[in-house]
């Protein structure tokens, strides 16, 4: 079992027979005073500082930024992890100072979706809870507001059991104190993970990467569909809505000549109308495809006319739908473009 740094700090203080308030001083230094190194924690005794540095290293964060790219409203940070693996995190800036963060959960990804650059890397390993949350801690320590978080970076979050430890850390009022409703988890349809999320974090926003209403085509585009078929995932999502009463998001990447036909739109309408009393809580986000030269099969985004036709069919049939605005595609910071392998 991997204990988080916060649990390890508590144990270290207990082992040194120091009073409990020393832990509270560390947490205050990190989350209230934005102190990024243990050496600068002026309220701590020297003996404790040395022990913290020996255990964790000089920095509070285990993620080390090695490169940054900026384009308009998007910043992409390449982080190095303690074992040398690298992941990417995206910071999106909106009007009135709102900041959103797209974070990674795995080094690489083993699911091989045909249109996704990350999937070409294969699965290297799961990120630890500290590595997941330290992506955000880095930004917090540098004065950013963590207004909303999405697990839409590298990897499939629900395939990493450490995700749930990370969510507990993010939700802990003494640490990050993030409301569940400010967190979104995107999944390709890992049913055991969906069920666990339903019961442990019912207020977290859930987004399902759909991309085709047809089982055979979805299996071709997303091999995970052979293990977790669309119809079985939809049943799990119905149960999630039944249990939580929360809106559920369906992501649909628009691929020119692949999944953007009238037949696809009509099949999607039928799929959602079959949800019965839960149909009104499904919302479809149509996403222009972000081109990448990393995938063996090449795709292009549907044009605006085709996307409007698709959206109009859904809307005319009472389906909640919107076309999502994308940021950062010119620096490979948009959905499906993250690689984390090279200096950016």
UniProtKB/Swiss-Prot annotation:
Protein residues bound to S-adenosyl-L-methionine: 155-156, 186, 209-211, 290
Active site residues per record: 88 (proton acceptor), 335 (s-methylcysteine intermediate)
Main enzyme class: transferase
Keyword Iron in record: yes
Coiled coil, from the record: none
Entry keyword Methyltransferase: yes
Subcellular location: Cytoplasm
Keywords: 4Fe-4S, Antibiotic resistance, Cytoplasm, Disulfide bond, Iron, Iron-sulfur, Metal-binding, Methyltransferase, rRNA processing, S-adenosyl-L-methionine, Transferase
Positions of the Radical SAM core domain: 95-324
UniProt miscellaneous comment: Reaction proceeds by a ping-pong mechanism involving intermediate methylation of a conserved cysteine residue.
Family label: Belongs to the radical SAM superfamily. RlmN family. Cfr subfamily.
Name of the protein this chain belongs to: Ribosomal RNA large subunit methyltransferase Cfr
């Amino acid at each position: 079992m991997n204990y988080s740094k916060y649990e390890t700090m508590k144990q270290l203080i207990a082992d040194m027979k120091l009073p409990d308030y020393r832990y509270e001083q560390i947490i205050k230094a990190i989350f209230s005073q934005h102190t990024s190194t243990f050496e600068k924690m002026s309220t701590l005794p020297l003996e404790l500082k040395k022990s913290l540095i020996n255990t964790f290293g000089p920095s509070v964060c285990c993620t080390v930024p090695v490169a940054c790219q900026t384009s308009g409203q998007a910043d992409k940070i390449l982080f190095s992890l303690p074992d040398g693996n690298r992941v990417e995190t995206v910071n999106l800036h909106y009007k009135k100072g709102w900041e959103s963060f797209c974070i990674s959960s795995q080094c690489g990804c083993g699911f091989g979706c045909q249109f996704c650059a990350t999937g070409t890397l294969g699965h290297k390993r799961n990120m630890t809870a500290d590595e997941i949350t330290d992506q955000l801690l880095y930004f917090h320590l540098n004065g950013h507001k963590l207004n909303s978080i999405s697990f839409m970076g590298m990897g499939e979050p629900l395939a990493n059991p450490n995700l749930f430890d990370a969510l507990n850390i993010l939700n802990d009022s003494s640490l990050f104190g993030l409301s569940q409703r400010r967190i979104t988890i995107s999944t390709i349809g890992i049913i055991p993970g969906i069920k666990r999320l339903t019961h442990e974090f019912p207020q977290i926003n859930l987004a399902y990467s759909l991309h085709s209403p047809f089982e055979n085509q979805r299996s071709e585009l997303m091999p995970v569909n052979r293990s977790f078929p669309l119809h079985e995932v939809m049943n799990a999502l119905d149960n999630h809505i039944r249990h939580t009463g929360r809106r559920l998001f369906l992501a649909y990447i628009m691929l020119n000549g692949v999944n953007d036909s009238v037949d696809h739109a009509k099949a999607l309408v039928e799929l959602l109308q079959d949800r019965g009393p839960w149909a009104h809580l499904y919302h479809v986000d149509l996403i222009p495809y972000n081109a990448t030269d990393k995938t063996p099969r090449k795709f292009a985004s549907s044009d605006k006319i085709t996307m409007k036709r698709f959206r109009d069919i859904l809307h005319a049939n009472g389906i909640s739908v919107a076309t999502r605005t994308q940021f950062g595609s010119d620096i490979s910071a948009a959905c499906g473009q993250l690689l984390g392998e090279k200096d950016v």
